[in-house]
Amino acid sequence: MKVSRIFLVIFLSGIFWLVIAQFFFCTRFQYKQEASAFQGNIIYNPYANINAANWEKCNFHAHGNAWNGLTNGSGSAADIHRVYDSLNYSVHCVSNYHQIDTVDAAQQNYVSAYEHGFNLMKTHQLVLGGRDVEWLEYLFPQTSNNKQDILNYLSLDTNSLVILNHPALRNGYSDKELSSLTNFNCMEVLSPYGISEKQWDIVLSAGKPVFVVGNDDMHDIYNKEQVGRMATILNLKNTNQASVLSALKKGEGYGIVLGKTQDPFQLPELMHLLVKENKLDLQLSEKARSIDFIGQNGKLLASFSDRKNVQYKLNTSDCYARAKITFENGTQIYLNPVFFTNTTNFAQVQNPINFTETIIFKVIGTLLYAAWLLWAWSFINGGRSSKSNRYEIPTFPDSTFPEFN
């Protein structure tokens, strides 16, 4: 009986510790009450220095068999690389959960990758270029402080790049959190688990230079429907890891969703996007059914039909403008934003630590867990029901009580 109580206490103590660690021991931060839009005297154009001959197709999010089949993924890393090579992808990663695959590490186009997160709400991040896996995680539905704490730890390696994965899935990031969280470089706007266009505009409207990524998020390499449907197109002179991460951080690329009849070997491309005297000049390799310019708070700024070349004048009130391009066969291109700024150093403003709240919550958490351990010790030892602690009611012979007439 006592052995079963011990095992029960150990199990419950572990669960209680996870709760205490997540909601009381996690660092707490101070967040801006209002987001700041893009503003400044400079217009940043991520396509200012591109060469239309240097577009390369990339996929950074794919899962194979890992952890002895415990996670969702079919096929080996070698299978994944072989299939993406056959579809003319210049860069393709295996991004298993909390595991950096090194099968192709000797290849010139190798980029280290892993997906971080095994929590209930699928609040996940993709880490590219990391040397080690970060194991800090919070299992239960996460608070803003939990998410910021994880992003801070993932960003400690300044050579790596952090991407918010499928933010629209299960509301992994709320609208308010997207406005306030920092320390991520890109967003997986294009995913088979949801197009996070609204979420991207929330981030951009908060004045954060976060650039688009499109990925297959493939879990079965043998399923043709999961492969080659979404991609990131980067402008690269070299396909090594340093060049790939640099292009992603500068926004020198775009996301693409392939229509069902789209030839994967003959994709429409951006020829140029020039900015002169606040006027944007966009040129495509083929005519598009529609070209929409979208700005602050997701507002439609302008729309054009049946064109391959368009111009739009960017106003300071627009703050930013990004183009969404749709072709007749359903293929869509999502360009990165052109925006007003005073600097091209895109280091995001950090959310400072709220030391007072952090200390108070840690003290409360410590007291709660200490109280739990005291109760657990009492429970294991039978509580107040043991003979040594039981109160015995004394008995008296009948003669000791007086008789009343």
Model features per residue range: what roles?
Residues 181-187, 207-211, 230-231:
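Glycine-enriched alpha-helix->loop->beta-strand junction motifs that scaffold or abut catalytic
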Residues 105-109, 158-159, 208, 287-289, ...:
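Short glycine/proline-enriched coil/turn segments at helix->beta-strand junctions
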Residues 68, 104, 191, 197, ...:
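Residue-level detector of solvent-exposed, low-hydrophobicity positions
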Residues 1-51, 221-405:
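C-terminal functional module detector
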Residues 22-167, 172-174, 180-182, 188-203, ...:
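A metal-dependent hydrolase metal-coordination microenvironment
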